[in-house]
């Protein structure tokens, strides 16, 4: 490894993360890292002797079941959530979803995540310049589709 010097505030992304040639993935990663820079500047400003305090605590993503998460898991969730909201704005995604599945309005409860909905997710992902999974998770965050788990 070679040591390099960059100006303060520079965001470095390992080339292997974006070498796949997937422009959508690269765009999401860059947006995710920019939100780390904005939301968590102290977490990534390392000085000698500075430790990372990490513990599990209750965190309630999207108002659903509680999950024990470490501080690192929480800040990753926050950066992912903000990147998704930035690239796939709520109002635009809702409108595009309703148009794609030919509904008259926003569903009162999430639609069941079933195979027939996959082409719609793919179409929306392409329209918003993201991959399938980030779009699927965004639709779940917005309560437009469920998570596919059956009781």
Q: What are the residue ranges of the model-derived segments?
A:
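Active-site hotspot residues in diverse enzymes, especially metal/ion-binding acidic/histidine motifs
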Residues: 1-151
